[in-house]
Amino acid sequence: MLQLYFFPMACSLASRIALMEAGIEARYHLVDIWTKKVLEDDSDFWTVSAKGAVPVLVLENGERLTESAAVLQYIADLKPELGLAPRPGERDRYRLQEWLSFVGSEIHKAFLFPTFWYRDDAAKAAARERIGKSISIAAEHLAGRPYLVGERFTVADGYLTWSLLLLGRGGVDIAQWPSLVNYVAHMQERPQLKAAVEIEMRLRKTVKV
């Protein structure tokens, strides 16, 4: 069975969404990302990943996979018939990688990471100044289309949905981008995605921030 190390409502939520959308059972290990402890047994998370970051996906052979873009594509490829990622070699596979990279670098690392991790107000303000342009790119792309890539839900949609849900907590109101408001509402109509978010929202209340 796959195992996922996660922190509630962190970027690892996208991996939970992918697993649930794929119908793949997994064992979930909650990590305190501040103390670097695995909460179920108080073990040292650094022994799981030298990066000290979630997600970490433990494969059935014991190998460990990190970084959201890699983890999400791995999960999608376990159930290729579901189309959670275009098949390797298809042109849209590169579009998927394009959007995974964009969300990871331009929204996640450029804004969400400094907003929730940095203590320096100047750094947070600088991140907030830049985020509007990045969000506008996603909003323009999604105007008149239901998904980031092609005509169906992919793991990139799960990753973007997570980031958009957190923007409000970071002081950015997506109401100024109607296409994104519609997109998030559309995504939350998906039973498995909605259930994944609800699970992590409940768990978030049990951990210190």
Annotate each PLM feature.
Residues 18, 76, 163-164, 197:
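Active-site-flanking alpha-helical
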Residues 36-38, 184, 204-205:
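Generic structural signal for helix capping and beta-alpha/helix-loop junctions
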Residues 91, 99-191:
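GST-like fold's C-terminal all-alpha helical module
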Residues 1-126, 139:
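GST-like domain detector, emphasizing the conserved glutathione-binding G-site
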Residues 55-58, 148, 194:
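Short beta-strand(s) of the beta-wing in winged-helix/HTH DNA-binding folds
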